[in-house]
Amino acid sequence: DMCGLFGIRRDRDLTIYDVRVAADAIASIINRLGRCDSSGHVITGPVWEYFADHERMFQPMLRHTPFRENDAVYFRQQLVSRDMDGLLREITLDRANGLHGKTVIHPAHVAAVHALSAVTHEEYHDALDILAGESGGVRASSYRNKMNELKPHRNWALRVIDRAAAFGVTRQGVSFVDLLTALASPGSANS
């Protein structure tokens, strides 16, 4: 365990990226081993070790709005009470930092990792648009909310296509809340 080498155990209110020594080590590993050239490897995110209710020092890390819009306010409360908000934040930060997937030691974490690993309709179509471009340049996303730079975003697009092959692509309008609630409900596979 990386933190164990330094006698550190992060609190459940912190992500691994809040622990500087661990975040710096992850950055070095990704820089050395996670490149998109032929020398790179797939690197998964570190384990999230918390799963039970506890007294919180900091505010929860999940916004209310997406859950209100999906009639899932109680579900959000359940996620927060089980420290899943920290896990969801860390999964998002893992991907932003070049990690793919998550090391899981508790069965309750599997659904969250899978839900946030699915490729959104928007990501998928942006990736296809980038990969279809034959020359450099910039195109507006079909969602009209960002620019897709054909050369700089090419490696990102390739990784999105790989992730789509492993975890699937959501339908248009399906949110992470939809996926989380569907995966948390036994026998539900509609999203």
Model-derived regions, located:
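Expand to "…catalyze enediolate/carbanion chemistry for C-C bond making/breaking, isomerization
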Residues: 1-191
